[in-house]
């Protein structure tokens, strides 16, 4: 029996031991054969996944190491992003796990080469796999053989000398968190004080700064939070202004959850970037066209967020708005959007209106059974934010749902609600109508980066469309689609993302 790991009693690794032993006996493979060539040499990629892929891993592995096994469809997608080169690049798998990504890379490279033993050994020699979990590294040595470099270490403590030992490609699905999971809004049972540590940004930084050669490629599957542009870590700025994005493909939290069989819930992106230079445009995957299209990064000083669904319809909307801005010499500045904050501690709330709690506030907005938007209210002993101001309130966490408060009757008692202040009744009604259209809802969807919450980045494109000089038609969706020069196919796609219908 070939022992994998120090703790053979661990169920997962005991199964792997049995699987390896059975396969070797069935195919008359000796230990020397496997040690020299690696077990992967004797397996097809499909066989490798059927033997070793486990969609569900232990809670300890997931929370302590941040380990998640990457499904084959996603791995193939990542490998397809890599440039085709005649020479064999040096490749680093930064958090190898059980070697799924490296195995797919090696087999893909092998299939496009002369299938000689020498070529296989050369591919293996070009690979370096780093993995913190020692049980996994034992299995990696068995799978990849003695020609590959397998390092049992923390990737963030790995510092190769770039001039001699740098890598042409760094690839991987880095751990998102380690030492415990990160609390998300939907998890009501976890205390944020018990949070683990988010490390995926550090993996990106470390790969670029300390592992890649100049003009080397980074191919990662990571959360897409950096794409909205206001990340405190500065990753958006670093990626776009110090490196060149080659292509990206975004995945919604629902699609990610589907890929990982219910073991993921994060909006993610596969990104291929090239070290050095500056990003001016890149290939952006359109879920509308099911293909890549060119995305131009130069959207003006107020536009930094990168869309997630597609850039084709977004480009048409942007082109139309920019043309009327240029024609009439209007401001390119987005309409002013205010995001509510947490109430001061001195403000107390009640579900009932009393003499001590006279001020009425909006908590949130919801859909009623008949499809009309309804509001949940409470009362406070002090006026809450925006009380007394004429405004448009977007109180629904996912869709906004424009609510007019022309008299300024309501305050806002919850954080993360969006407010537009405007005294002109006609203009604010026009904006309210526009923000309830399928087109506006689609644009909101195109700029969502965490769960399904409405983001402030989703308003960067929104200029003051109520300005009569712009000439936008109000009250007629078909006329609006025509004004933006959308095709019937465009319109159909936009409508499919309108999950709720609004009533005047």
Named regions from a protein language model:
Residues 1-120, 128-143, 458-502:
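Class I S-adenosyl-L-methionine
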Residues 59-64, 91, 185-190, 412-420:
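Glycine- and acidic
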Residues 124-128, 417:
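Short active-site oxyanion
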Residues 3-6, 10, 194-198, 425-426, ...:
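Structural motif
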Residues 255-493:
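C-terminal substrate-recognition regions of SAM-dependent nucleic acid methyltransferases
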Residues 89, 168, 391:
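Conserved acidic residues
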Residues 64, 73, 100, 198, ...:
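Short, well-structured alpha-helical interface segments that form or flank functional binding sites
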Residues 70-77, 95-106, 121-124, 132-138, ...:
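Signature of N6-adenine DNA methyltransferases within the class I
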């Amino acid at each position: 029996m070939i022992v994998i790991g120090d703790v053979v009693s661990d169920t997962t690794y005991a199964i792997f031991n049995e699987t390896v032993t059975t396969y070797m006996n069935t195919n008359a493979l000796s230990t020397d054969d496997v040690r020299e060539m690696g077990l992967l040499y004797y397996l097809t990629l499909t066989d490798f996944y059927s033997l070793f892929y486990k969609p569900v891993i232990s809670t300890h592995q997931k929370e302590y190491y941040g380990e998640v096994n990457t499904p084959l469809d996603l791995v193939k997608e990542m490998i397809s992003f890599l440039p085709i080169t005649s020479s064999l690049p040096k490749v680093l798998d930064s958090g190898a796990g059980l070697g799924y990504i490296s195995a797919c890379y090696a087999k893909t490279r092998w299939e496009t080469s002369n299938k000689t033993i020498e070529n296989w050994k050369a591919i293996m020699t070009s690979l370096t796999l780093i993995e913190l979990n020692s049980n996994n590294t034992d299995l990696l040595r068995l799978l990849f053989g003695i020609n590959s470099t397998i390092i049992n270490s923390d990737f963030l403590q790995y510092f190769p000398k770039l001039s001699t030992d740098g890598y042409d490609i760094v690839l991987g699905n880095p751990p998102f968190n380690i030492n415990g999971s990160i609390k998300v809004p939907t998890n009501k049972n976890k205390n944020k004080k018990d949070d683990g540590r988010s490390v995926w940004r550090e993996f990106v930084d470390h790969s670029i700064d300390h592992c890649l050669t100049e003009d080397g490629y980074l191919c990662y599957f990571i959360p897409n939070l950096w794409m909205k542009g206001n990340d405190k870590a500065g990753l958006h700025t670093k990626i776009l202004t110090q490196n060149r994005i080659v292509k990206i493909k975004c995945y919604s939290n629902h699609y990610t959850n589907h890929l990982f069989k219910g073991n993921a819930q994060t909006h993610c992106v596969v990104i291929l970037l090239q070290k050095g230079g500056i990003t001016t445009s890149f290939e952006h995957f359109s879920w509308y066209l099911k293909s890549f299209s060119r995305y131009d990064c130069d959207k003006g000083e107020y536009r930094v967020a990168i869309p997630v669904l597609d850039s084709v319809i977004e480009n048409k909307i942007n082109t139309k708005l920019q043309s009327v801005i240029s024609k009439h010499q209007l401001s390119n500045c987005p309409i002013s959007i205010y995001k509510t904050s947490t109430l001061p501690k001195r403000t107390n709330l009640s579900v009932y209106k009393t003499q001590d709690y006279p001020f009425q506030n909006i908590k949130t907005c919801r859909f009623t059974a008949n499809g009309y938007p309804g509001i949940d209210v409470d009362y406070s002993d002090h006026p809450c934010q925006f009380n007394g101001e004429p405004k448009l309130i977007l109180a629904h966490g996912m869709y906004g749902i424009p609510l007019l408060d022309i008299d300024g009757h309501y305050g806002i008692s919850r954080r993360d609600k969006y407010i537009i202040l405007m005294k002109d009744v006609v203009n604010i009604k026009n904006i309210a109508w526009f923000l309830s259209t399928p087109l506006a809802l689609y644009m909101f969807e195109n700029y969502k980066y965490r769960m399904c919450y409405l983001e402030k980045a989703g308003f960067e494109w929104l200029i003051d469309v109520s300005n009569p000089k712009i000439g936008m038609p109000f009250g007629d969706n078909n006329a609006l689609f025509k004004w933006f020069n959308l095709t019937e196919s465009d319109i159909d796609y936009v409508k499919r993302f309108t999950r709720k219908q609004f009533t005047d």
